């Protein structure tokens, strides 16, 4: 079992309905259940990947997964924005039938602070997944899987009791909307959750760019896998990158190109 894994890499969302199918099959689970690793890249367009024809951006590791797996040519997100798409992914419902249909809402939900990339704050209203909402994590947990979410949940609104550990995940390592201290800055975070405990990242104090969120998330994911070698597990690894163009940590691959990285960032920001 520990040598078998299903790995999915996706830029947006799971096809709605798969969580519901998993619920029907959970009672038939056998000892030969595969491990499941689901990797989500935030705001990554399929045209940005080399394996889908991009001539600009180099994605060698994703290309390796594509070469040994299956590429989908007609796979659609539940929504074009973050929270509704993640809600469709977690519940298996299309956006028209799911609880979360926008990043913000005008009625219901809870209000809280939102921090912009520039560090400004504003008050917004968000809704969250409720205890009665079945997620793929609750289904797999009931089937005997160890479940873990690493990094971005984005389905908690401003309710601390709607974090991943209250929605089917045994472990959570990442940041929450409901806690301002953990959701900014995104890429060199000062704080981060370990289940329901807020951990301070001393290395990034005073705007020091020492521990990148992608590296922290990768380490958390690897450690979860190591701890669960003998268990069937479901790992949902939801990276922030490449959500914003300014998070690029190393651009030396592109030093010899005729275009500049600023050109790419400008096109991304204005698209």
Question: Which residues does each predicted region cover?
Answer:
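Formylglycine-dependent sulfatase
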Residues: 2-4, 13, 20-271
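Sec-dependent N-terminal signal peptides
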Residues: 8-9
């Amino acid at each position: 079992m520990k040598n078998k894994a299903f790995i999915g890499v996706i830029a947006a969302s799971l096809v709605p309905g798969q969580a519901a199918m998993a619920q029907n099959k959970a009672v038939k689970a056998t000892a030969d259940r595969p491990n499941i690793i689901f990797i989500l890249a935030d705001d990554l367009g399929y045209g940005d990947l080399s394996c889908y024809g991009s001539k600009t951006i180099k994605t060698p590791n994703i290309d390796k997964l594509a070469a040994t797996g299956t590429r989908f040519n007609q796979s659609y997100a539940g929504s074009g924005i973050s929270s509704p798409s993640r809600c469709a992914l977690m519940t298996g419902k299309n956006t028209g039938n799911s609880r979360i249909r926008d990043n913000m809402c005008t009625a219901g939900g809870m209000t809280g602070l939102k921090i912009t990339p520039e560090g400004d704050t504003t008050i917004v209203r968000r809704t969250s997944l409720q205890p009665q909402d079945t997620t793929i994590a609750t289904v797999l947990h009931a089937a005997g899987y160890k479940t873990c979410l690493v990094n971005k949940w984005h389905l908690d609104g401003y309710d601390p009791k709607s974090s991943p550990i209250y929605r089917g995940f045994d472990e959570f390592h990442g940041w929450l909307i409901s806690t301002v201290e953990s959701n900014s800055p995104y890429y060199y975070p000062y704080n981060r959750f370990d289940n329901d405990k807020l951990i301070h990242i001393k290395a990034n104090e005073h705007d020091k760019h020492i521990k990148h969120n992608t590296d922290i998330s990768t380490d958390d994911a690897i450690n979860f896998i190591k701890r669960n070698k003998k268990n069937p597990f479901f790992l949902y690894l939801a990276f922030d990158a490449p959500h914003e163009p300014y998070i690029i940590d190393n651009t030396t691959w592109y030093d010899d190109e005729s275009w500049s990285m600023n050109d790419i960032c400008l096109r991304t920001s204005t698209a």
